[in-house]
């Protein structure tokens, strides 16, 4: 039945504003009659003005990005332009920029004094090597200020007190009282190497430390909830803020971790992280755990109950279970908690998983070197991603599986062995080298 016969046009137009832009297109693509309302749909994401102009959809976009260059310097600025980029050396601005512009980016080649022309409702300002004084012109609505390639003396004198999100770009000086008192997000910049701790405001909740930072973090304020450590950080972790909920660790870290906060929810190592030490201090609050490429330690008595997503790196190849004698019987003891729903193994994992998978698992990813037959898949598992080298013969035991994601080359080799299936949208995001297939059930 056509959806138009169920919902009238007015009802559909009430539904569409509540959907993401991609879902709006999918929704109206259900039938030809519904697709006819495309010209009156409004889109909410950011889109480049030039692209939408070619498609004739400028008036359908609420948030446009417009790049001003020497070629389009006299082009009319429309009311639905929210993000303006100034990429020209010519001094062409004669009046205050329109109030509809909430995000402004000034490139390093822009030479005009922009201060008097900053729009009154500006919320975000990005300065690329811009050294003219503008602080007195910044409106009280400004919340986000980002510096890129800007001298440290310029930075200190450009920050308005109402800024809550601050990124310092190439800054390599010291931190201090010049930081806004209401700051919540602080990115100290990729070149920052100084001391950090009580010299940042008590309001900071998210702290990003750059790739050259390798100083002590033992003095960080307890109010920090999100902490990202750069690629050069390699100090032992034995003290962290008590309220920390998310911790991200860069690829150069290979020191011991002897303490993690009790409220930590997310712990992620960089994909290329060289960390390879036992971790025995994971808190019960942890829900997402992602390990780096070189981690290859035992996980027995390591993972907490309550963990939902678990991802191992390419070189992990340790057992995930063991057989123990209990009473008069031999039983399998699993190392991965049953709470895990999404489990991903890396390229070189090739251990037996029969009986060792969590009973609540819904998605499993197996690497290209996995060659063992799998005969025990929990009934909850629906999605399996397979890579080159996997033994397709074991699929006969997987009656509950509904979807597979496999390499194109593997599919061509095994397509006659697969159960009856259909191809599901080869152009799906993230499926560049894969086919997603759906198993047909009798």
Swiss-Prot record:
Q: By its UniProt entry, which InterPro entries does this protein fall under?
A: FNIP, STK_FNIP-Repeat
Among Pfam families, the record links this protein to: FNIP (PF05725)
Query: Looking at the keywords, is Repeat present?
Result: yes
* Organism domain of life: Viruses
What parts of the sequence cross the membrane? Answer: none
Please provide the record's keywords in A-Z order: Repeat
Repeat (FNIP) positions are 213-252, 253-294, 295-348
Protein name, UniProt field: Putative FNIP repeat-containing protein L170
Provide the species name.
Answer: Acanthamoeba polyphaga mimivirus
